[in-house]
Each structure stands twice: as structure tokens, then as C-alpha cells.
């Protein structure tokens, strides 16, 4: 069902102002659990390949019409979890803002986790994003390390993480 109570029409595209999104995945070894590791499922062998896209259509607000496409991968093999995603995003301003430019961005991440003990998982992640658009310099890169401890019998997980935020291609560095 669609909530039509407050739906407006886009001034630019003359269609309902909504987030239109879709995702297509291929899981050749059965359904991939939506977990980044689970101590109760340490004998899994799953893999996922995906493609996603979305268009966010704004109405008369002084905002943007955004388009995003992405590729994803995830794998769960016994004690090991791996995942990666890459995406492209285009931000186009609405006519009301009187800005004729649009901006394109690239980003992505890779992450992994490994159970070193029955309830203790070590994890690492690396994010990258060109926050000034593909036409200008200015990348953020954020490496992170962490650990997850899963308590027995209560569906509770304790997480600890250290993340460093760095940038390059800017006039000043962090």
C-alpha cells in the first residue's frame, strides 16, 4: 500500500515525490542470513551478489533529486564473514534552487569478521568516500578495527570499535 495522505508531486519531474528503490540479489548457496556473523551459525557456507538502485524524487522543497546505484558482495564461510559494497550517487538540484550543477560521488567499503573464540569475533572495516564529488579532490577514508562479544542465551552483543577518520586531497589534513 502507498501512503497518499501527504504525497506531493515533483515540480521538476511531475511524478509522485517518493523514494523509488530496488535491490536484486543472487544467492547461489541458499538464503544469506542478514547477520555479520553469529556464534550459533559457525558452519554456514553462503554467498551473495547484489545490485541496488534508488531515485529520491523531491517535490517543491528546496532540495535535490538523487540517484544512487550500487554493487554488493557478502560471504559467510564457517567462522569468516566478508562483505563489500561500491556505489555511485548523483545529486541534482531542483529547478527551484536555480542551480544548474549536479554532483557525482563514489564510495564503498570492505569489511570482515572472524570468530577467534566461540563467542568473540574480531572485525575490520575500511570505508572510502569522495565527499566533494568526482570533479574535486577530497576523499575521506576511514579504517576501523573492532571486536564483538556475543552473550550466551540472551541475544545481546557487546561491540567495541576504533575508527580513524582521515582525508586526502584537501587544503588541510586532519
Q: Predicted segments — roles?
A:
Residues 2-8, 29, 56:
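Short acidic/polar capping segments at secondary-structure boundaries
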Residues 7-19:
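Surface loops at the rim/top face of extracytoplasmic beta-rich domains
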Residues 10-12, 96-98, 136:
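Outer-membrane beta-barrel and related beta-rich outer-membrane complex signature
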Amino acid at each position: 500500500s502507498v501512503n497518499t495522505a501527504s504525497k506531493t508531486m515533483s515540480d521538476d519531474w511531475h511524478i509522485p515525490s517518493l523514494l523509488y528503490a530496488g535491490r536484486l540479489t543472487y544467492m547461489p548457496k541458499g538464503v544469506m542470513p542478514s547477520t555479520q556473523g553469529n556464534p550459533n551459525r559457525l558452519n554456514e557456507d553462503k554467498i551473495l551478489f547484489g545490485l541496488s538502485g534508488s531515485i529520491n524524487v523531491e517535490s517543491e522543497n528546496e532540495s535535490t533529486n538523487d540517484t544512487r546505484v550500487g554493487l554488493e558482495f557478502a560471504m559467510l564461510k564457517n567462522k569468516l564473514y566478508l562483505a563489500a559494497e561500491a556505489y555511485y550517487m548523483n545529486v541534482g538540484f531542483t529547478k527551484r534552487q536555480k542551480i544548474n550543477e549536479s554532483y557525482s560521488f563514489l564510495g564503498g567499503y570492505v569489511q570482515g569478521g572472524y570468530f577467534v573464540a566461540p563467542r568473540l569475533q574480531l572485525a575490520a572495516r575500511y570505508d572510502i568516500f569522495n565527499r566533494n564529488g568526482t570533479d574535486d579532490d577530497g576523499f575521506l577514508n576511514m579504517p576501523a578495527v573492532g571486536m564483538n562479544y556475543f552473550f550466551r542465551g540472551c541475544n545481546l552483543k557487546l561491540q567495541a570499535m576504533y575508527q580513524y577518520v582521515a582525508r586526502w586531497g584537501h587544503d588541510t589534513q586532519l
